[in-house]
Amino acid sequence: MKYSFENLALSGGGVWGIAYLGMLEELERAGALAQIQRVVGASAGAISSMLISFRLSAAKTQELSDSLDYSKIPQKVADPATPQLQAAHKAFQAQQALEPHAKNISLEDFICLLRLFNKKGWYSSDYFYHWLKGVVASQFKDGRPDKKYTFADFAKPALHKNDQPFRQLHVIGCDANAHQARIFSAELTPDVEVAEAVRISMSIPFFFEAQNFSYPGQPAGVFVDGGTIWNYPINFFDDKYPAKPKQGEDKEEEKTFGARFDAPLGKPSPDANLIQHIQNIAQSAWQAQNLNYQYSPRDQARSISIKTGDISATEFDISPGDDNYQRLFQAGATATRDFLSHCER
């Protein structure tokens, strides 16, 4: 069956993004994946959008995705501690005013504490950034992980492996100083490194270090997770690619569809420490944005709604093939089959 969709919008959601792999498998099986020409995403949706932009098979996309070691993403120490830093840690532990807690703070947590004050985030995103660079490089002829491949490069098939044309990629970031979303794309930010834009888009406030960035034509600012302000950009393409009346029927053909996460509110999460508090704030922001979706029958009809069960979006203790990975993968596949079956009616 031929579907009307040309554009795909993906929601953010941390490790829930694994479910997009199951979604891709079903879209490919139905012939819908080949029709997608443009992708947009925030946070985890930006990561998946980048992978989908390569126009690989669902299996090859999963292979790239599975090379990510989720346990390394919340990275406490990016570089070896210098002697000066170790001395500062010992001096911190010796502070009588902080007793008894100061002596219990490890060197790793001390580094995180400094990062929180200096870079506005507990964890480093260096590992993730270098993983992104390696994945991007693998899709180019010269294949150099040290090179900064830009959005302009993504639009030049002659540079790509096998001269493969990529899908148009759009990434959502949040300019905290300007209080608004910023769009990264070949049209708006041709000279920006794609890996840097995706890193910005997944930088959950206070959980990961914020990114200092100068968006073209704007003052330098502090950038954080695009999902903070626009977690599910389902309407991103609507002005340029509006729905059209379906011939002979009293309904319209949508050019854009999307995938989002349906997380149960359930019982309150623990909030016993800073990390749990940050996780709760992030998930509260995502839930607040869900109100827009809940009051839009149109968006509901064109969305793959993936049930996440009791798996937390920041549950990084997950790896390919384990129980939670399989649950998310199957949740994405099941939701996609259900969505496509409704499209065929």
Where does each model-flagged region fall?
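Gly/Ala-rich beta-loop-alpha elbow adjacent to hydrolase catalytic centers
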Residues: G41, G45
